[in-house]
Curated annotation (Swiss-Prot):
Matches recorded under Gene3D superfamilies: Acid Proteases (2.40.70.10)
Protein's name in the database: Aspartic proteinase nepenthesin-2
UniProt xrefs under Pfam families: TAXi_N
Thermal profile of function: Optimum temperature is 45 degrees Celsius. Thermostable up to 50 degrees Celsius. Retains 44% of the original activity after incubation for 30 days at 50 degrees Celsius.
Amino acid sequence: QTVQVEPPYYAGDGEYLMVDLIWTQCEPCTQCFSQDSSSFSTLPCESQYCQDLPSETCDCQYTYGYGDGSSTQGYMAXEDGSSVPNIAFGCGDNLQIDSGTTLTYLPQDAYNAVAQAFTDQINLPTVDESSSGLSTCFQEPSDGSTVQVPEISMQDGGVLNDLQNLAVSFFPTQCGAS
């Protein structure tokens, strides 16, 4: 039996949608939100998830490579306290913002600042799509002119990463459509 799970997400809540991994805050984590879950656990060597990893040792460590050549590594863990039991996921070490993950959460204040800076730079009228979760939706120019998308970068530990065309998705048919 196959069960499809689709979590409720709203782009205006601070997440960016990119690839097929689930990420969440895990220990050890410096400068993180308080966390205390009685249903969180690292996976034991005997678990099927660990057995499926291409590793010679039993440490349940993983490495995942992205299409652009970057990668992440960490350990496998499970969460049993949600409405979907036994969710296994990777706990990446020292991730600050990972623009290539399925879900990267920004605290609301941080997301608002990024969204406002982007809106200020794109210089187009916005379309109210808050009911669909699209908080940064823009009206196309009526004269058919080309939209100039602002440069977007992220500073991570002193390294400036150019995110242009890597972490921004454009869905012109979804904005303003009912």
